[in-house]
Amino acid sequence: MGIMIDVLNYKLYGDVTVYDIIVVIVVMALATIIAKLITTNLRRALIDKMKRDQLELMLKVIYFGIIIVAFIAVLPALGLDLSGLLVAGGITGIVLGFASQSVVANLVSGIFLISEKPIKIGDQVNIDGVAGFVEDVNILSTIIRTYDGLYVRIPNEKVFTSNITNYVAHIARRFEYVVGIRYSDDAEKAIEIIKRIIEEHPFALKNPEPVVFVDNLGDSSVNIVVRIWAPSTEWYNVKMELLWKIKTELEKNGIEIPFPQRVVWFANELRANVEGKEERRQA
């Protein structure tokens, strides 16, 4: 036992002993094992959610990050004093820290977005006022192609902390019309026509069932509310097609959409007419 202790306490150089070297080797071996376990589990979890090149890049950053942290932790055991280096690089470290803060935040947010998958490529979304199609979800940013054909790059930190509206996440989406008809028109007939048009459209869903009803009596019209469900991918086309068909079919059946109307009554005009009649009688 005494010989073993002497061997462990044997100084190789300076104050560094054999025991210190063994500690360094064990720590680095454990760090390597931990890094491999973490990256392996992440690869299994994200292999179907990320592009292969992006996934491999992220795993390498994590792997070598763990190794570097472990290596820095064992440097004092090798007799290396980092205090001078830290002081000399303090200002540089602060500058790099501020510069890399947003990069790290975007990287972490990107990992969470890819894991949670609130959006995917091809989805129609609205993120912080930017509406369009998701073109790509990268590690640091998300690319949106707007309806005008513009490409907008949004940092993942902003995407992750913003309210995300995904228009196609649900299989079906509802839209609504308010159709006004004249008071002289038959509201029941108008409802029957609208229901028939909806039933004839191949993409107007039967379940949930469309709803057509008189909602209120307006100043110039009887207002009929029409609520229809359609597949999210066909929602816009169905909405535009049915709106035009409802208009044309109602007009064919003599049911018109009235213009706003106002009845204006002038008290002075009535008084002037009465006075004019009296003057003519006296003459």
UniProtKB/Swiss-Prot annotation:
Transmembrane segments: 18-38, 61-81, 94-114
Cell location: Cell membrane
Keyword Transferase: no
Keywords for the protein's UniProt record, in alphabetical order: Cell membrane, Membrane, Transmembrane, Transmembrane helix
Stored Pfam families: MS_channel_1st (PF21088), MS_channel_2nd (PF00924), MS_channel_3rd (PF21082)
Its membrane topology: Multi-pass membrane protein
InterPro entries (UniProt xref): LSM_dom_sf (IPR010920), MS_channel_1st (IPR049142), MS_channel_C (IPR049278), MscS_archaea/bacteria_type (IPR045275), MscS_beta-dom_sf (IPR023408), MscS_channel_2nd (IPR006685), MscS_channel_C_sf (IPR011066), MscS_channel_CS (IPR006686)
Main location: membrane
GO cellular component entries: plasma membrane
Keyword match Transmembrane helix: yes
MF-aspect GO terms: mechanosensitive monoatomic ion channel activity
Domain of life per record: Archaea
PROSITE patterns per the UniProt record, alphabetical: UPF0003
PANTHER family: SMALL-CONDUCTANCE MECHANOSENSITIVE CHANNEL
Family assignment from sequence similarity: Belongs to the MscS (TC 1.A.23) family.
Name of this chain's protein: Uncharacterized MscS family protein AF_1546
